[in-house]
Amino acid sequence: MRIALDAMGGDRAPQVVVAGAAAAAREGVEVLLVGDEAQVRAELARLGADLPVWHAPDHIRMEEAATEVRRRPQASVRVAMELLKRGEVQAVVSMGHSGATLAAALLVLGRVKGVERPALLVEFPSLRGRTFLLDGGANADCRPSFLVQFAAMGLAYAEASGALAPRVGLLSIGEEEGKGNALVQEAYPLLRAALGERFYGNVEGRDIFLGTTEVVVTDGFTGNVALKLAEGEARVLLTWIKEALTSSFRARLGALLVREALARVKARVDPAQYGAMPLLGVEGAVFIGHGSADALAVKNALLRAKAMVEAGLLARVRQRLSALHV
């Protein structure tokens, strides 16, 4: 199995991206770097690594419009999608322009049957392990039917990740049926009819971290706000802990005793540990990461893509969508 990595995608590409690819290759991932061959090979030489490169002379910059991918067939992310469509790779990972990656996936791969809009799945750490939220930002405005499809795809991903009998919660401002805006109120009966016992009902923001359900569905605007809020809060809490543990000589002594435990906590809330978000609902395995990703995040994105392809994620998504009871 081979994964195409957009070597030109990200704030610090190709340096960080190539470094992450080299690290993933050492852990058994077969990576094909797609990008400007001269730049990519220069980075490989600097690292003393030997990975295959597919030349793509163009790339979509962060400040450019996502629609640019339509008129630039030699852009690295579009070339990677073409390789996926032809079966020369089994997944695509990009840490670059998320809008351009979404546009390229829709343009080249198309949607899975039964999907009106693809969704980004975001993984949150929780007291029970992890919670998968859709949509993480691909669709700011949603119809109720979109949330039903998000739920089916989220269940497929949770099952591919090893969850047993996962359930879906609908993000709202109260647990009771009837709470929430028009979208939530209209989606509730559709989810109940489509999912049966797999639908838990309404959940609140805190339930994402409590792990009340394995999957949470919402519109992409709300989902992205939740993601950025969680990232900011994690950063603030870690900063406060660091300040408290370095505030005095006694505190620094105490810090030595809990150093390993704190390192484990930090790892659980570090976005780099999750690598990239899967774009569910397109005809192929596509993963989109942070533009600010470091080499660890790139490596973990590739490892996640490999694991999900091996778990048959796309087939699971198709099956879940075809089994909807509506």
Swiss-Prot record:
It comes from the Bacteria. GO terms for biological process: fatty acid biosynthetic process; phospholipid biosynthetic process. GO terms for cellular component: cytoplasm. It is found in: Cytoplasm. GO terms for molecular function: phosphate:acyl-[acyl carrier protein] acyltransferase activity. Keywords: Cytoplasm, Lipid biosynthesis, Lipid metabolism, Phospholipid biosynthesis, Phospholipid metabolism, Transferase. It is an enzyme of class 2 (transferase). Belongs to the PlsX family. Catalyzes the reversible formation of acyl-phosphate (acyl-PO(4)) from acyl-[acyl-carrier-protein] (acyl-ACP). This enzyme utilizes acyl-ACP as fatty acyl donor, but not acyl-CoA. Homodimer. Probably interacts with PlsY. This is Phosphate acyltransferase.
